[in-house]
């Protein structure tokens, strides 16, 4: 196209007037601008012309043919119009079968969309009009308006199969159905026409690797139950995995309904272990019992379900399967753990000095020897936990180690024996027995606590903890009573035994005892009846808080509040009545109780509104000692949910900069709760900085949390940090916490975890959370509780301890070493096909240790696991279809 001529004016000669010069310059600038604009327009025109000219002969022909068909579609003769429309359909279908780029027919017809709409409006009723509606429905995808024309014209169309228009069309249609459904529901209009389309779309999506889209559509139109008729062997796992993850982002009670659909699908496909996991997630005892009934004739599956329930530390209601009672009771956990220790060659006991890797400076040892001996006792217990022997407390030659401690230090030192012999009832009781009848009261009290620790998570027909501890509940010595009651709380956490309620609940009414005793009674009852929502016990707690009045604000009263909160752990709306009742309690005690109950009720849910409530409480402008509890509550609510945890880190960063002293003291503890036994570098760096803070309580909390996030991992980086801190705080009270953290880091010589999440991080163990919360609530007043007389509360962590192993057994429950691949787990939610679930794997022979983010899969096809998640104790059965070259097949032949 020829460029337009532009005339540039020549300025007149002569005349030096400034105003005229300015005027001339202005005119020149305007003309130059006009010239530039004209040149740009010319360039655009040239590009446009060039683009039009570059159409290939085939494209040019297609464009002309389509324009001709559009023109003929307005023909008055229906036969001609219908033929033209059918030809248009053929052209569009041939291009929409693969939507890798914008199809050319849609591109060329886009400019004719309004023309076709006018033709439709002016057409008479008949086949031609409905056929044109089908075409308009497809073209509306490229139109880009918000009128939902794709759905509108689909409903007006001929009703032909949507599959013929391709996947992209179906996806677009499903999106518009979701929006239209909400609008019609608000206006109380019929949605039958939409549901008919849904019944057509869902089968198409389910058979074309689009299960997530099918689930989304059914969720939006509230018809999720229809998914059952489309489930088969090929798609059930992807559907359930997607629905399970969706439940995190759906408010109640819809989240429970989604999870129940998952359970029904798993039961339909006979995936009973997976069904049981989801039922435990819902925390529905009836559903759990029903699943057990379905497999009562299948011994191997029944045993595998028993191992899953034992890991969660719960007992199903009306349980009467004697054949697996040993499994449910965790009776053989010690045996399996010792097999792991033997295989890893780590049974030899370690001394605390081997963990410290440097002897204490002589001057500091003399200045605070009793305190450092106490620290060594804790470290010895943590490091040798579960191995049955150590070099300080259970050695054959009596070292009299406990004599090197003073008063309550003796209690904790003797109690540490229970952690060394953890889970081994037969062998452990004999090693504790020698302390039980000592004339030294602190020694015998420590033995009572040790018995409780020994049987934590283990059930036995002999019931040794109850028979040995019950007689001391009404002792005249308060220390003895506290030891026995705390021991019972650790031993029977999560059992919800009514005989223990009748035994312990009268202790709450004891007016003669101080708040420390009442607090420990409340904590023990909370641990035993964790998540039970027991109304009788809840009422008793509230009455005690009211009766105690101002004493309910004392430091140890926090454990009474925590006990009440634990009753509602994870129960969400079930805690509303208790929260309303607590509003009647005025003062700081009532406020602490309300915050604790609300946080416990929504533990691990990631509930954004509750997190906002806690943040709002922190920002009220007044310096409130309970701000620290609100910070800890944020971590409790967000834990276990990856996105929420990341958001918490950012919140805590802001709170560190702007918050008051109570907030700053709680943040290290909150970080420890957010990531136990999972040493994330971001958290590690924050805690490393805070461990040098000028406020001693901030520094001590940070040091303790370094131990919590690295617990049982032997993490080299944290180990280096703690050794440096031991030198830095060589003559300081902080050294006690450095030693505790070093002991936690090497928990069980690196074989245990305190993280409450298991089964590929999908299930939260309430008992494990309870143990962590007991320690962290004590940490909120670290100066007056953990640093002084109540250091025995460090042992509450025993409720959270569990071997982080994968052990494979045959159908006779004998160890069966097999090759497994262990690597970083990969999020495969919403991915089509069968993608890899791990990356960067290494091949090992079971038993093996698994890290927080690690997952395992069998590296051989000789066996089939009875559960899809290889974690903890897994039963394998021989694969009847094993390849001929495999060792198992050769052995059979």
UniProtKB/Swiss-Prot annotation:
Biased composition (Basic and acidic residues): 16-32, 40-59
UniProt cross-references to InterPro entries, sorted A to Z: 26S_Psome_Rpn1, ARM-like, ARM-type_fold, Proteasome/cyclosome_rpt, RPN1_C, RPN1_N
Chain residue ranges for the region called Disordered: 1-59
GO MF annotations, alphabetized: enzyme regulator activity
Gene Ontology biological process terms, A to Z: hyperosmotic response; proteasome-mediated ubiquitin-dependent protein catabolic process; regulation of protein catabolic process
Source superkingdom: Eukaryota
A single Gene Ontology CC term: autophagosome
Protein's UniProt keywords contain Membrane: no
Keywords for the protein's UniProt record, in alphabetical order: Proteasome, Repeat
Record-linked Pfam families: PC_rep (PF01851), RPN1_C (PF18051), RPN1_RPN2_N (PF17781)
UniProt PC repeat ranges: 412-445, 446-482, 483-517, 522-555, 562-583, 666-700, 701-735
Function of the molecule: Acts as a regulatory subunit of the 26 proteasome which is involved in the ATP-dependent degradation of ubiquitinated proteins.
Family of this protein: Belongs to the proteasome subunit S2 family.
PANTHER family according to UniProt: 26S PROTEASOME NON-ATPASE REGULATORY SUBUNIT (PTHR10943), 26S PROTEASOME NON-ATPASE REGULATORY SUBUNIT 2 (PTHR10943:SF1)
Name listed for the protein in its UniProt record: 26S proteasome non-ATPase regulatory subunit 2
Organism: Dictyostelium discoideum (Social amoeba)
